[in-house]
């Protein structure tokens, strides 16, 4: 629906796509059009799993053969754009009201195991915040998520059980 609202001429949804499908879909999109038209083609990766969406993006980029390249944008469940908006609003408020930013701030994100909270924590940690994500189903589960973020995004995020 966002692509339609943005004025795209054609939107073709694919459902139940997995990693093994990505290369074929990307190459079908790039090789079935001229180079000029391929540049006007984009793949929007949705779903509900941020790690899988990023894996799909990485594979999509590796599947391209220059100069046949297209845009690829992952935003599973709208989480990346929602997290970016949340962090941007927080930064704006800190700047306007307190003349500061997120660097070296202690940031606690409740629901941090969820997709939006997790991406927000990653963004804040990348900016230099000291982040804690709070989960509600035991310290083991939230610790696994914090470790996943550390391994994939090279950020230090502390787990806490709420």
Task: Please tell me what each predicted stretch does.
Residues 65-73, 103:
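Glycine/charged-rich beta-loop-alpha catalytic/anionic-binding loops adjacent to active sites
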Residues 43, 75-76, 106-111:
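Extended hydrophobic secondary-structure segments that form protein cores and membrane-embedded regions
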Residues 37-40, 69, 125-132:
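Short, surface-exposed connector motifs at secondary-structure boundaries
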Residues 1-68:
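N-terminal ligand-binding/catalytic initiation module
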